[in-house]
Swiss-Prot record:
Chemical reaction(s) catalysed: 3-phosphoshikimate + phosphoenolpyruvate = 5-O-(1-carboxyvinyl)-3-phosphoshikimate + phosphate
Keywords carried by this UniProt record: Amino-acid biosynthesis, Aromatic amino acid biosynthesis, Cytoplasm, Transferase
Organism in which the protein naturally occurs: Oenococcus oeni (strain ATCC BAA-331 / PSU-1)
Disulfide-linked positions: none
Protein name as catalogued: 3-phosphoshikimate 1-carboxyvinyltransferase
Residues engaged in binding 3-phosphoshikimate: K22, S23, R27, S167, Q169, D314, K341
Annotated pathway: Metabolic intermediate biosynthesis; chorismate biosynthesis; chorismate from D-erythrose 4-phosphate and phosphoenolpyruvate: step 6/7
Amino acid sequence: MKNLKTKQFQGLNGSLLLPGDKSISHRSIMVASISRGISRIKNFSNSTDCLSTLNAFLDLGVEIKKYGRDLIVYGSGLDAFKDPKKPLNMGNSGTTTRLLLGLLAGQSFNTCLVGDASLSKRPMYRVTNPITEVGGEFSLTGNGTLPITVIGHPSLKAFDYHLPIASAQVKSALIFSALQADEPSIIFEKEATRNHLEIMLNDFGADIKTNGLCITVMPRPKLSGRTISIPGDISSAAFFMVAASLLPNSCICLKKVGLNPTRIGIISVLKRMNANIEVKKTSNEAEAYGDIIVHSSNLHAVEITSKEIPNVIDELPILTLAASLAKGRTIISGAGELRVKETYRISVVAAELKKLGARIQEKSDGMVIDGCPKLQIPENNLATHGDHRIGMMLAVAALLVDTSKTITLNNPEAIKISYPNFFRDLDYLLNNPDMKG
């Protein structure tokens, strides 16, 4: 348990470097491992999830050396993995699991994937079904959850596949399978999703062409190791962006944050809500990054529709908090994807914020939120439910409760899944006078 800070009238102030983007960190190890030669990865995320990816590839025989936030990966190509001879532990990482289902489908050995209790409740059919359709094979439990054994087939066939849902993880798994096919493959997206893997693979020498929602993957590319600098994680930045918007007297600068167009939906939505946000782009690399400056503001309600959901899917918990204190009624729809996160996030976010007096109506694919002037003191402890993003959202929410009483958060350790130093960085911004607004 952790006692949360409350009643913060001085706001957040200062500059902060965010940890490396979690989505890019996962993919950087995978791409570096299937390339030939040495890759240097700078600002790798130290989140528990990304360390699960690191450990999985060590178990697959890849030589990786870690120096603080940087990695050196000695890649040997797509066909150089070694049979681990034991189950690969995915921890709590759905990204590691789903992407490995695609990558290992084309190997010459079988691999069993296991995970913790939370991950072992999450369905994997949404990945195994499409990969099975294109030639992969899996041995699953009756309900499609971990443990799963990937039956390796080193002769995968090319495919054309229409994704039934907007999911970057399913798309990425299919791309990894397509790299091991005998001919070019085509993937059709339902909605555009984060494209970090496509950008990175092309940077390493792959031939992947995107035309609207159509992605063509050429097989068996000659990938060469290179250096990657991972920008700050915008999904982690979102918690500070909302906190600074809601807390009076705030002025923060979040430095070198990733500004990939498929990830900046959080900025667009907050600006529509009347947030005072300025973005200063400082890099024009394939994965652009820049500084995000946020001042306090009075937020207004908005509507968030299914077309926006893929680009704010990880930020919906903290956006729900923002909507709970915004003027008017916010409607979120088309967010059924939240059913397959660490928790059923729609229900859990609504339940936890209702403890604080938020006015939320739960819908099958979203929420209706009526803004209230202030949050209340909860009668019971707040709980992360093992979900890192809910934990960080509740830590921000506690700052907005006008009380000298203690608010306690159960299972704060879950936050380490994506942001081990979250509370340290939050304390820094709460106690830093160098940019008083």
